[in-house]
């Protein structure tokens, strides 16, 4: 299929239900997910499936060529994808953060141009923000001012999910010493193919094996003035203002929660099928089928209750996020704070439920279910890996600080 064919197919599909489009894709991926997870590497074919589906522009407004879907719908798509393939759910969820950043921090011209191009060309986006230094905001990648008002980026980013194979890259750097505004953060959206950008094939981890979350190097990468999102430190100013521009943290945390809940739901449904068709009852149970074992039934009840509660909380938070998004510049710091408290709670519940379900499904499938051919371990490995992104204890503390002291979470990249 040519790029033109991909574009036409994607544009034609944007009049349907994006959730059903996601389900159709996952039915295709279901039969190969275990083998693909074992192999690791890049999810090139599956990413092209997503490109051709048109889902990459699910949150782009319709007048700019996208689906125009709301956040509850987009997050449901994340859950559907993650339910079958955690790595793809991870990649797609991270992809959604870039159109959001462009909308939140870009100029009107940048929003019009970049979001339209994203929709018309079915761009994948990647990110290059995290670094492996003394703390999470100890950034060493430099953004050296250029004479034309742009910058030259130099350094190495880590955990660059989706950078490899992407078309547009969201990157952050700091102005080095010796220049006005030294230490200020510069954000930019640049073509991944720009000279000097080098996404590396060096990602290794317990889980999320096919997310290409390795390093990305920047060798004197030229960033044009019209690719810079806002002025230096505009991001921190947006966080301090605690208005619409600070919604990046809530969006990312709810995306993460949706990935977790999708993976957990996938683990539950896959284990249920195994229990129904292959598991054996324990002799003292006095039953002939595993599905009649009272302890197995109880375990599934516990799994279902946890996910029922977490799903309900996540969907409520998604509605609140959409309401905050729609308020635009009228969003108050109080409304933003209340939203983040809700999402912090969702993140905590989703993390706990997903870790419990993905580790305990082995109790209801039995020893034979641990054979590598079934791949049940992938659910827990993916959850355990990604839930280490930012400590859930701090999300619980954010809720606790609000309940006890009526203090809202401090706006930032993760809150």
UniProtKB/Swiss-Prot annotation:
Inhibited at high concentrations of FMN or FAD. Keywords: Cytoplasm, Flavoprotein, FMN, Monooxygenase, Nucleotide-binding, Oxidoreductase. InterPro entries: Acyl-CoA_DH_C, Acyl-CoA_Oxase/DH_mid-dom, Acyl-CoA_Oxase/DH_mid-dom_sf, AcylCo_DH-like_C, AcylCoA_DH/ox_N, AcylCoA_DH/ox_N_sf, AcylCoA_DH/oxidase_NM_dom_sf, DszC. It catalyses: dibenzothiophene + 2 FMNH2 + 2 O2 = dibenzothiophene 5,5-dioxide + 2 FMN + 2 H2O + 2 H(+); dibenzothiophene + FMNH2 + O2 = dibenzothiophene 5-oxide + FMN + H2O + H(+); dibenzothiophene 5-oxide + FMNH2 + O2 = dibenzothiophene 5,5-dioxide + FMN + H2O + H(+). Gene3D superfamilies: Acyl-CoA dehydrogenase/oxidase, N-terminal domain, Butyryl-CoA Dehydrogenase, subunit A, domain 2, Butyryl-CoA Dehydrogenase, subunit A, domain 3. It comes from the Bacteria. It is found in: Cytoplasm. Its EC number is 1.14.14.21. It is an enzyme of class 1 (oxidoreductase). Residues 129-140 are annotated as: Lid loop. The lid loop assumes one of 2 conformations allowing opening and closing of the active site. Homotetramer. Reduced flavin is provided by flavin reductase DszD. In a coupled DszC-DszD reaction both FMNH2 and FADH2 can be used, maximal DBTO2 production is seen with 5 uM FMN or with 35 uM FAD. This is Dibenzothiophene monooxygenase.
